[in-house]
From Swiss-Prot:
GO terms for biological process: diaminopimelate biosynthetic process; homoserine biosynthetic process; lysine biosynthetic process via diaminopimelate; threonine biosynthetic process. It comes from Rickettsia bellii (strain RML369-C). This is Aspartokinase. GO terms for molecular function: aspartate kinase activity; ATP binding. Pathway: Amino-acid biosynthesis; L-lysine biosynthesis via DAP pathway; (S)-tetrahydrodipicolinate from L-aspartate: step 1/4; Amino-acid biosynthesis; L-methionine biosynthesis via de novo pathway; L-homoserine from L-aspartate: step 1/3; Amino-acid biosynthesis; L-threonine biosynthesis; L-threonine from L-aspartate: step 1/5.
């Protein structure tokens, strides 16, 4: 008997009809004599509607306002969890919903992008012993002040991964509207090849670099706890999947796993003579702000950072306060940027790869503003209007579909 965590995304539960159609998927796992715990997202579009409503009544720039914002946003997952429990009960399957405070899932105090500190598994284990399927409302936790705190966009993926880790699950399945992870965005490369198997570190880099199929926090958790994860389609579960797992790599051989892009970025330039590079980076990273790329443009004077566009408002408030306190002299924001990332083990050791890439892009009049290289990733900073052309160029140039890995 295995323990399987099943997470159903927003498109999988958009309507009552779709909620009913995931029941055979749950039944199929039960028929294998496996135990199942389910995590659900809000119905597709609901969270966006709730965000819009909150923005209409509040500036959302104070902690007390963000606390209420979290209460509003978490309601979408609560509705889905109860509806799925009702649907399963109609099929004579014992099921019950759980909200974050009932387990509890404990978080820190960073409203709207909280980090989970612990997951109590006692109630979940009791349910499994009684053959009751727990259905957990994703995306939410509760802090030490007994306030709901949401985990940020993609938070239901994070919830599923955390439950899998806490319960020592055998596998975590993420059901979405695509059949797995692709070597490039199918909207740009319609014939992009599906990756049948990918290791944890590559998946994490793809997620960090803009791949929408899995949130980076979830990828990081399953890598840390070595939990196999599958990405598969709710609407075609028989069409195969992508397995995210641990496997040996030949580090000296360049194997390109995929290309991903991210337009939802903010390029920040900061000038300061009183704060050094590390001090500025530490300030930017506070409150769980993710830094994609950082660079010291001019020693002890000018620094640049690439962060998530969603952090723009909070960072503007933060940097304005620093400027008013004379800790920095100036800052600028640029939102017309994007990154294109090439992921693959050992690519740093291929000395000709970067030369070939930059030569090809220059020939096609694509201006690469910045390059950052790690062991398994090359990041290119470009204008956001050149993303599609860049991805097309690189997919053709690197012949990803012919590597045998994807």
């Amino acid at each position: 008997m295995a323990l399987i965590i099943q997470k159903f995304g927003g498109t999988s539960v958009t309507t009552i009809d779709r909620i009913k159609k995931i029941i055979p998927i749950i039944k199929a796992e039960i028929a294998k004599n496996n135990q199942v715990i389910i995590v659900v997202s809000a119905m597709a579009g609901v969270t966006n509607q709730l965000v819009t409503l909150c923005n209409e009544v509040s500036s959302l720039n104070k902690s007390s306002q963000l606390a209420e914002y979290d209460v509003a946003l978490s309601s979408g997952e609560i509705v889905t969890a109860s509806l799925l429990a009702l649907a399963l009960q109609e099929e004579n399957i014992n099921a019950r919903s759980f909200l974050a405070w009932q387990l509890p899932i404990l978080t820190d105090d960073n409203h709207s992008k909280a980090l989970v500190e612990s997951v109590d598994t006692n109630l979940l284990n009791e349910c499994l012993q009684q053959n009751i399927i727990p259905i957990i409302a994703g995306f939410q936790g509760i802090n030490k002040h007994n306030r709901l705190a949401t985990l940020g966009r993609g938070g239901s993926d994070t919830t599923a991964a955390l439950i899998a880790a806490a319960m020592k699950a055998d596998r975590c399945d993420i059901y979405t509207d695509v059949e797995g992870v692709f070597a490039a965005d199918p909207r740009i490369i319609p014939k992009a090849k599906k990756i049948d198997e990918i290791d944890f570190s590559e998946m994490l880099e793809l997620a960090l670099s803009g791949a929408k199929v899995l949130h980076s926090r979830a990828a990081e958790i399953v890598m840390r706890y070595q939990i196999d994860m599958r990405i598969l389609s709710t609407f075609a579960p028989e069409a195969g999947c992508t397995l995210i797992t641990s496997k040996d790599k030949i580090m000296e051989k360049r194997i390109i796993s995929g290309i991903t892009s991210n337009k939802n970025l903010l390029y920040i330039t900061i000038e300061s003579s009183s704060l050094n590079f590390i001090q500025v980076a530490s300030i930017i990273a506070q409150n769980n702000n993710h830094i994609e790329v950082m660079q010291e443009i001019e020693p002890n004077k000018r620094y640049s950072f690439i962060t998530n566009l969603t952090d723009k408002n909070s960072l503007h408030i933060l940097l304005t306060n620093l400027k008013n306190n004379n800790q920095i002299s100036n800052f600028t924001f640029d939102t017309e940027i994007a990154t294109v990332s090439i992921i693959g083990h050992g690519i740093k050791n291929d000395l000709k790869l970067l030369e070939v890439i930059l030569s090809k892009l220059a020939k096609d009049n694509i201006n690469v503003q910045m390059v950052q290289i790690s062991e398994i990733k090359i990041i290119l900073l470009i204008n956001d209007k050149q993303v599609e052309k860049t991805v097309l160029d690189l997919y053709d140039l690197l012949k990803i579909s012919e590597t045998g890995h994807c």
